[in-house]
């Protein structure tokens, strides 16, 4: 799974016509660009900075889950900090995705768990409840159901619908193969230029075809 990036998975879903290509909002960013995330969605529906249902989901969670928190983009409170993140990491969760703000940025980034959020706010979370766990939610613009595959890296987060994982992976692998061929073509062009040999056509076939279609 790690050989396929969220970008390649998005391209795979684009070829299959999946809504938004599974791409969460561009302002949902990782706290640490060096961490790769992959796991099964455990969803949380909450609002107004209330982290009670997030606590419940963490302590009921299992290794391999990615906590997907539909926080409605709330910015007046943090939904969590490094204590909750530390508990999630200790339990073995594979990642945390929050459509809202967090705090304790440095502490969260140092944990052995990928965390994605829309920003930072020092104000403490609310504790109201009840919220909902493992229902279909919309998080950062993408519909997420329990059991969906959630993948993230420095580019952002991608969600693959549970029932379409195999076909998306196949489409993404096809895209990955194409990219390898393009990298080889680019490397070959560079070598030809450096060695003074005849330069091949570097443009992808689709570019040439579109140009010819417009002529």
Where do the PLM segments sit?
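Feature captures the catalytic cores and cofactor-binding loops of soluble hydro-lyases/lyases
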Residues: 1-146, 160-215
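Beta-strand-loop-alpha-helix segment that lines the small-molecule cofactor/substrate pocket
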Residues: 153
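C-terminal binding/interaction regions
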Residues: 150
């Amino acid at each position: 799974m790690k050989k396929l990036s969220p970008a390649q998975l998005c391209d795979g879903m684009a070829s299959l016509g999946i809504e938004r290509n599974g791409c969460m909002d561009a302002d949902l960013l990782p706290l640490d660009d060096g961490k790769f995330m992959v796991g099964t969605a455990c969803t949380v529906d909450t609002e107004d900075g209330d982290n009670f249902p997030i606590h419940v989901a963490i302590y009921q969670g299992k290794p391999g889950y990615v906590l997907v928190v539909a926080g409605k983009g709330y910015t007046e409170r943090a939904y969590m900090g490094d204590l909750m993140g530390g508990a999630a990491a200790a339990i073995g969760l594979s990642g945390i995705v929050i459509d809202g703000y967090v705090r304790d940025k440095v502490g969260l980034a140092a944990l052995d768990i990928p965390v994605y959020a829309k920003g930072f706010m020092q104000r403490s979370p609310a504790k109201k409840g009840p919220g909902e766990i493992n229902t279909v939610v919309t998080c950062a613009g993408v519909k997420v159901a329990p059991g969906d595959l959630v993948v993230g890296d420095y580019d952002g987060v991608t969600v693959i619908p549970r029932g379409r994982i195999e076909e998306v992976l196949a489409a993404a692998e096809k895209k990955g193969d194409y990219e390898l061929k393009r990298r080889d073509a680019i490397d070959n062009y560079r070598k030809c230029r450096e060695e003074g040999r005849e330069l091949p056509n570097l443009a992808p076939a689709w570019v040439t075809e579109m140009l010819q279609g417009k002529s």
